[in-house]
Amino acid sequence: MPELPEVEIISNFLFDKIKNKQISGVTVNNWNLRVPITQNIDDVIKGKVINNIKRRGKYIIWHIDNDIVVTVHLGMSGKLIYAKGEQAQNKHDHVIFSFSDNTSIIFNDPRKFGLVIILNKEQEVNFFNDFGIEPFTDEFNGDYLQKLLKSKKVNIKSALMNNKLIVGIGNIYASESLFRARISPLRSAQDLTYKECEKLATEIKNTLSDAIIAGGSTLKDYAQPSGSVGYFQNSFYVYGKVQKPCKICNNTITLIRQNGRSTYFCNACQN
């Protein structure tokens, strides 16, 4: 699943390519994603102009004329593909947004876990009302993180992946951030010291920033709308490295399951 860095990259690309463009039409080839696509989507947004594009957590948000909000989530395998001119449609091209300059954005999702819905401004506020803090905000620091975690009895990795606490951090970046902070994913979130929270908040920001600079992590499905892939996977310390030597201490990387998810860490480096 694309996490914060990948969604940030896609949002920035779309901001550069389709902001201020007029939508000439929407073609829906498959209405039945995990949340059904808004039925009258073409009627609602055809002829309208995209005023802004932003990210909230792992969601891509298009602000359109008349307080219309197109909300997109890529699910497990979704992509937004930028195309010029007529394109042969592929099997999993579920939604095609066409623009007046003969370009288009194609929502392609083999596993159909993605989401494309229309909201108004009030619905947008309600939709994101219980989302947690954005990691790149100034407010997100050691003091904030310690206060956030002080009553959380779950393991720290699960806490980092809880969208109601902190948005955008999935399995990859939780594992990598914890390694950089030298904190074991087995630790109880509420037991972290202030210094550990300070270090963790810093390393979360550093890890996410480094991933964005590297174009994201391409393991299976992720690609930028241009078709370019990411390279941050080449910088992983622990994720996907089971039975391989730690880059820091040469100890073997361990794989366990936490809440049904794979967790990779170094027993020697992370305490």
UniProtKB/Swiss-Prot annotation:
EC number: 3.2.2.23, 4.2.99.18
Cofactor note: Binds 1 zinc ion per subunit.
InterPro entries assigned to the protein according to its UniProt record, in alphabetical order: DNA_glyclase/AP_lyase_DNA-bd (IPR015886), DNA_glyclase_Znf_dom_DNA_BS (IPR015887), Formamido-pyr_DNA_Glyclase (IPR020629), FPG_cat (IPR012319), MutM-like_N-ter (IPR035937), Ribosomal_uS13-like_H2TH (IPR010979), Znf_DNA_glyclase/AP_lyase (IPR000214), Znf_FPG/IleRS (IPR010663)
Active-site residue list: P2 (schiff-base intermediate with dna), E3 (proton donor), K58 (proton donor), R261 (proton donor)
GO molecular function: 8-oxo-7,8-dihydroguanine DNA N-glycosylase activity; class I DNA-(apurinic or apyrimidinic site) endonuclease activity; damaged DNA binding; zinc ion binding
Necessary cofactors: Zn(2+)
ZnF segments: FPG-type: 237-271
GO BP terms in the entry: base-excision repair
Pfam families linked to this entry: Fapy_DNA_glyco, H2TH, zf-FPG_IleRS
Protein name according to UniProt: Formamidopyrimidine-DNA glycosylase
Native organism: Wolbachia sp. subsp. Brugia malayi (strain TRS)
Gene from which this protein is expressed: mutM
